[in-house]
Amino acid sequence: MKVRVVAVGRDRSGLYAPAVDEYAKRLGRYLRFELVEVPEARKLAGTAGAKGEEGATLLAKVGPRERVVVLDERGDELTSVAFAERVRRWMERGQDVALLIGGSDGLAPEVLARADERLAVSRFTLAHRLARLVLVEQLYRAMTILRGEPYHK
């Protein structure tokens, strides 16, 4: 199984990228993992236009057979253990998974329509780059839970 996080934007501040890279490296011990960054849309077309452009770019990166899981504030809120169980089910299916993170304006309706699942990383509103870090860390945590390793206590 391959897991990809497909996210809008880059961490220009350099604040989150080192931690995301570290967890991505750790994840490589457990599964095939890839972080795909797509460019943010220019706001010239307005919020709806930018969301639509970003949505089209996100969907272009998704394979026809990939399970699509979007991060959405209205998605399922899971504990780390419940998320690990969800990851286990994905692994049992043997289906590749694409986890999509929208930009600062959220996800386009077309992206939400394509989603097989919706997950929320928190009830808080998070910067989308911070949400990326939380998601990658939780993926790593899920793998350690599934393997019975001591990272999750």
Curated annotation (Swiss-Prot):
What is this protein's name?
A: Ribosomal RNA large subunit methyltransferase H
- Residues that coordinate or bind S-adenosyl-L-methionine: L71, G102
Q: Output the Gene Ontology cellular-component terms.
A: cytoplasm
List the subcellular locations. Answer: Cytoplasm
Kindly give the InterPro entries that the UniProt entry links to this protein. Answer: Alpha/beta_knot_MTases (IPR029028), RlmH-like (IPR003742), tRNA_m1G_MTases_N (IPR029026)
Q: Which organism is it from?
A: Anaeromyxobacter dehalogenans (strain 2CP-1 / ATCC BAA-258)
Q: Which UniProt keywords apply?
A: Cytoplasm, Methyltransferase, rRNA processing, S-adenosyl-L-methionine, Transferase
Q: What does this gene product do?
A: Specifically methylates the pseudouridine at position 1915 (m3Psi1915) in 23S rRNA.
The entry assigns this protein to a family as follows: Belongs to the RNA methyltransferase RlmH family.
Q: Which Pfam families match?
A: SPOUT_MTase
Q: What is its EC number?
A: 2.1.1.177
Q: Which PANTHER family match?
A: METHYLTRANSFERASE, RIBOSOMAL RNA LARGE SUBUNIT METHYLTRANSFERASE H
Named from the GO MF annotations, one term is: rRNA (pseudouridine-N3-)-methyltransferase activity
Question: Which catalysed reactions does the entry list for this protein?
Answer: pseudouridine(1915) in 23S rRNA + S-adenosyl-L-methionine = N(3)-methylpseudouridine(1915) in 23S rRNA + S-adenosyl-L-homocysteine + H(+)
Q: What is the lineage of its organism?
A: Bacteria, Pseudomonadati, Myxococcota, Myxococcia, Myxococcales
UniProt xrefs under SUPFAM superfamilies: alpha/beta knot
Q: Which residues cross the membrane?
A: none
Its subunit composition reads: Homodimer.
CDD domains linked: RlmH-like
